[in-house]
């Protein structure tokens, strides 16, 4: 999946040069998301997983609460990245408001009305599932990524299937470290 994400991101970046300005901006914002969230964010989480696990396990709350809170925090971070990229539209060659990778340029609007508000019940559902099933952290990553892909398909149609690696990573990273931090 990671190799496919790398290949598709490279193709998107290469095709961005010939695309109309708004399309180019969206493609470059998407590629930037892959670099910042999937690449850099994923690498930092992987390198810091043991200290994070020790920290999270030291918090005196039920693990289900910690899982939901940690996944929600990571979803908020991911949306901060995407909203920032949307607000950087002029850096990508188009006026602010001409190209979006989020529902809005307003972070609070995005998280409270469009994304994280929808994710939290899904995180609660995963906490319930993890109480009864012993999924590995990698299985949680993949399965939640597929759930995210299905969600993106409800918004963007079958086109989202061609971006399956992107959506599996974007969503999977939100739950990988919380799942890794389980007792």
Regions found by a protein language model. Give the residues of each.
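Aromatic-rich, lipid-facing transmembrane alpha helices and their immediate juxtamembrane interface loops
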Residues: 1-183
């Amino acid at each position: 999946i990671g190799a496919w994400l790398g290949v598709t991101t490279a193709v998107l970046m290469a095709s961005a040069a010939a695309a109309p300005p708004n399309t180019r901006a969206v493609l470059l914002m998407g590629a930037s998301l892959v670099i910042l969230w999937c690449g850099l964010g994923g690498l930092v989480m992987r390198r810091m997983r043991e200290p994070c696990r020790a920290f999270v396990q030291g918090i005196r709350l039920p693990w289900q609460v910690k899982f939901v809170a940690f996944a929600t925090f990571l979803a908020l971070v991911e949306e901060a990245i995407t909203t920032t990229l949307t607000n950087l539209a002029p850096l990508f060659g188009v006026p602010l408001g001409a190209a979006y990778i989020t529902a809005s340029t307003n972070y609070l609007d995005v998280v409270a009305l469009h994304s994280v508000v929808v994710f939290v019940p899904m995180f609660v559902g995963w906490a319930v599932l993890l109480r009864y099933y012993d999924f590995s952290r990698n299985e949680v990553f993949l399965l939640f990524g597929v759930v995210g892909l299905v969600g993106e398909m409800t918004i963007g149609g079958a086109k989202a299937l061609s971006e399956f690696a992107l959506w599996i990573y974007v969503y999977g990273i939100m739950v990988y470290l919380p799942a890794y931090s389980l007792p």
